[in-house]
Design a protein with these regions (language model features):
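Local pocket/hinge segments that shape ligand/substrate recognition
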Residues: 35-36, 46, 69-177, 192-196, ...
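Long beta-strand-rich cores associated with HINT superfamily self-processing modules
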Residues: 273, 346-391, 400-403, 658-669, ...
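Surface-exposed, Gly/Pro/Thr- and Asp/Glu-enriched linker/hinge segments
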Residues: 29-40, 72-73, 79, 110, ...
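Periplasmic binding protein-like
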Residues: 54-69, 74, 78-83, 224-284, ...
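Ligand-site clamp/hinge motif
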Residues: 32-75, 228-230, 682-715
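Aromatic- and charge-enriched surface segment that lines or borders ligand/interaction sites
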Residues: 53-61, 107-119, 123, 444-448, ...
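Append "and occasionally in soluble cytosolic enzymes with long acidic Gly/Pro-rich linkers
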Residues: 112-224, 325, 371-373, 378-384, ...
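Extracytoplasmic/peripheral linker and loop segments enriched in polar/acidic and small residues
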Residues: 118, 130-133, 230-239, 269-349, ...
Length: 820
């Protein structure tokens, strides 16, 4: 996907590490440093059955599987010397609800009422889902981040305050009151509205046992409290049509068993998750912002999450307050309900080394295949995948499923990546040389010769005198050849910038360059882009009206880097404007045309035919008329036409691998190493990321009894990678009997790897009589996945005094549990 300034629904990728040499050399490769990955080839092979995929890895038919194996098979896999298990603690299971009122006045959709949606939180047994359906591989979840996210410590007070517990009687009482007020009656235990049963249509994913079990569980609970339930079964392809592609008011669905795959890379300050999961403006809510459909609206959530996404805050505290407001309102609205954060066991052959278990993407991260190599000298790997193709691969409003994204990101590079264990921004193909800002309130002058695309005039115009911005980022794109052999240059940068401005601006009726999913998100970002200055072809200044307390986040939003040649983007633009295809799924559904997908041969043939027309017309886009000659354009058209003829698809990019072949009938996708000398990075460049430096709580010494109003002391011992280490942050939170956080703070270092928590009398006075819970998070500053200790402490009247300390040593004692 193109990485453009403020492209708000961007799929975050993993990051680039500084060069480090490695001793290992794949015997299939020359002994000199080579460009790109260690591997020569990776084949993605369809394996829908996880158990069969596991057996294939054991037998050597597959090298790894880019989907979790069954939880019940994980323990045996850990003890099998042929295998290595990688746990992924990202991704979640939940339900998406349809809040649209029915078109038929005699039909009642219960989920049009916020109170009924919210009541489902008490009808869902999250503990059962974790313990029985997930076999303990997960944790209960009510928010979009989860306990292992760096954001969780910022929102823990809000999340803990809800205190959801499985209570079907309480849920039924709420639901009964609302339905009765709406005119429904309960006849013999069944809800009736205007003579019709109150029916709920549940689309249950049957291509995954966990989602199917969870859907059946909720369907049964709904039946128990009087609803008629219509179960519908399908896979992601069906969900793309019925759930994400239909008009909500048609009520083709009312509940969908949804899985969120997590971010495509680990992100420290996640600017868009709250917006994607809760707010309409990013097109992730029912209706998808398609003007032809009924849409869920929430202006308050839009405003809050836009402030987070576009850094419209003046301090870290203000930003975190906004995040808490968004999460609180999102949970209260309950259009999207989170049920469980998964711990997914992924498996690879023990002979495969170098896989990088990114805290967001797991071993499916871009880094894994860039760094993977086999101990048997084989330069090719076979990777099983659950689905080979379940949605469009176009970079505008496609790449919405985890299966397509994980492969596409192997062949496409972006301007910035993310550290796989800290989530911090690191430059990749658009390294920055300077970040200038005067803070959140002061402005910088934008040079008069900085330019922006003017949609009305159809030309680049200068910013002129008097323009200003909060920040300036200077960056130097690392060009290479495209996979079709044509050299990247300034024209690709300009056209990528043009496209976002052209299609991100809606001038009103008659504007044809509008997409209902792309345009609303892009338009919000464009308000903050104040101009681009192309100083030289490889030195660009970007002026943006944003500020962040972490300057690297400013750079991430200001730099950009295209992931497809301008001629492919221009050809697709002409095809879409001709009404043959649409960029977004909802627009394709509305118009009854295809969802543009350049990996599909039929659509690639349309691109090829359009390129031939462009060649015959000697066409040069208006945005490039002063940059590209007719001869240069024709050279590009010929190269891309030749590529499509040879490969049968139009996926042309710039990454360390290129997409060689897509065989839908055979269920395979093949990517090969891009060994072009112009590629900027050598094999071994990412090897430092093979082993995260994780913190481990080795002991917690806490009083058995804490006297309210008296000081209390707790000792915590922490190791990193098996050694005592001071490069650790230890946070603690104490919740009372109602689940409200009443005490919080940071433990203080006392010796190497030893931390002390001293709670003063005025704080212990806030504890509830009886059991309270303390959660301790120990996080290595080099790997932001915490080790978590949860312990019950008893608060007693002051006269009782403190009991003798107990050293728990990371074992289950009483009500303590420790998560890793």
């Amino acid at each position: 996907m193109r990485k453009l300034a403020f492209q708000s629904y961007i799929f975050y990728l993993v990051i680039l590490v500084l060069f480090s040499s490695v001793a290992f050399q794949n015997s299939a490769l020359s002994q000199t440093q080579i460009k790109g990955p260690f591997l020569d080839q990776a084949r993605f092979i369809l394996r829908t059955d996880e158990n069969l995929a596991l057996e294939d890895i054991k037998s050597g038919s597959l090298d790894t599987y880019f989907y979790a194996i069954p939880n019940e098979a994980a323990n045996d896999a850990r003890n099998d010397p042929r295998l290595k298990v990688y746990d992924k603690t990202a991704g979640s299971l939940g339900f998406l609800l349809n809040p649209a009122p029915a078109e038929d006045p005699n039909i009642l959709n219960p989920f049009q009422f916020k109170e009924i949606r919210y009541a489902l939180n008490y009808l869902i047994d999250r503990e059962f889902v974790v313990n029985e359906i997930l076999k303990g591989y997960g944790s209960p979840l009510i928010d979009p981040f989860g306990i292992y996210s760096p954001e969780y410590l910022n929102i823990i007070d809000t999340v803990e305050s809800f205190g959801f517990r499985y209570n079907p009687a309480y849920a039924s009482n709420i639901i009964s009151g609302v339905l009765s007020s709406a005119g429904a009656t309960n006849d013999g235990g069944k809800w009736i509205f205007h003579g019709n049963p109150v029916t709920i249509k549940v689309l249950i994913r049957q291509d995954d046992a966990k989602k199917q079990s969870m859907g059946e569980l909720l369907a049964s609970e709904l039946e128990k409290i009087g609803f008629s339930v219509q179960r519908d079964y399908g896979d992601l392809n069906k969900a793309n049509v019925v759930v994400y592609g239909s008009d909500p008011k048609s009520l083709q669905w009312q509940i969908y068993t949804e899985e969120i795959g997590g971010t495509s890379a680990f992100v420290k300050y996640n600017p868009i998750t709250a917006g994607q999961m809760y707010a309409p403006w990013l097109s992730g809510m029912p209706g998808s912002q398609n003007p032809a459909y009924w849409n869920y609206h929430n202006n308050t959530l839009d405003q809050i999450t836009q402030k987070i996404a576009f850094f419209n805050f003046t301090s870290e505290d203000e930003r975190n307050n906004l995040l808490n407001d968004a999460v609180k309102m999102g949970i209260q609205e309950s259009v999207r309900l989170f049920v469980a954060q998964k711990t997914d066991p992924f498996v690879a052959s023990a002979k495969i080394q170098g896989l990088v278990n990114d805290f967001g993407a797991g071993i499916t991260s871009k880094y894994s295949l860039l760094n993977a190599r086999s101990t048997d000298g084989n330069a090719s790997v076979d990777i099983g995948v659950k689905q080979i193709h379940q949605g469009s691969w176009n970079t505008i409003a496609g790449l919405q499923d985890v299966y397509g994204k994980s492969i596409y990101f192997m062949v496409a590079d972006q301007g910035t990546f993310r550290h796989p264990y800290t989530g911090e921004v690191i430059p990749f193909r658009s390294p920055w040389t300077e970040i200038v800002t005067n803070g959140p309130l002061d402005k910088l002058d934008v040079p008069a010769d900085a330019i922006k695309w003017n949609q009305t005039l159809q030309q680049w115009v200068q910013a002129g005198e008097g323009s200003n911005a909060k920040s300036k980022v200077t960056f130097t794109p690392l060009y290479s050849n495209w996979h079709n052999g044509v050299k990247m240059d300034l024209s690709d940068m300009m056209y990528a910038n043009y496209f976002t401005q052209e299609w991100g601006t809606d001038t009103g009726p008659g504007d044809r360059t509008v997409d209902p999913e792309f345009t609303p998100a892009a338009s919000e970002a464009l308000n903050l882009s104040k101009g681009i200055r192309f100083v030289t072809p490889d030195r660009i200044e970007s002026y943006v009206d944003i500020w962040h307390y972490d300057k690297k986040e400013i750079a991430d939003s200001a730099v950009f880097f295209p992931s497809e040649p301008w001629e492919i983007l221009a050809a697709s633009e002409r095809i879409v404007l001709d009404g043959k295809l649409a960029y977004s799924r909802s627009e394709a559904q509305t118009k009854g045309i295809g969802w543009y997908d350049p990996i599909v041969r039929e659509h690639a043939e349309l691109i090829k035919a359009e390129l031939q027309k462009m060649k015959n017309e000697q066409f040069v886009p208006a945005a490039l008329k002063d940059t590209v000659t007719i001869q240069d354009a024709i050279k590009r058209y010929d190269a891309s036409i030749d590529w499509i003829e040879r490969h049968g698809h139009a996926i042309i990019s710039n990454g360390a691998f290129y997409l060689d072949n897509f065989n839908p009938a055979g269920g395979t996708i093949t990517i090969n190493a891009f060994r072009d000398a112009s590629y900027p990075f050598e094999a071994g460049h990412w090897s430092n990321y093979e082993s995260p430096q994780l913190a481990d709580i080795t002991s917690v010494d806490v009083p058995r009894i804490v006297a309210a109003g008296q000081p209390a002391s707790i000792k915590v011992d922490v190791q990193v990678a098996g050694q005592r280490n001071g490069n650790v942050t230890v946070d603690y939170f104490v919740s009372n009997k109602d689940g409200a956080v009443v005490i919080r703070g940071k433990a203080q270092p006392e010796a190497l790897g030893q931390f002390g928590i001293d709670i003063p009398p005025e704080m212990t006075a806030k504890l509830s009589p009886g059991p309270n819970q303390i959660k301790i998070f120990a996080t290595s500053n080099e790997a932001l996945r915490p080790d978590i200790s949860s312990t019950t402490i008893l608060a007693a009247p002051r006269s009782v005094g403190s009991g003798q300390g107990a050293n728990f040593n990371n074992q289950t004692i009483g009500n303590q549990s420790t998560a890793h």
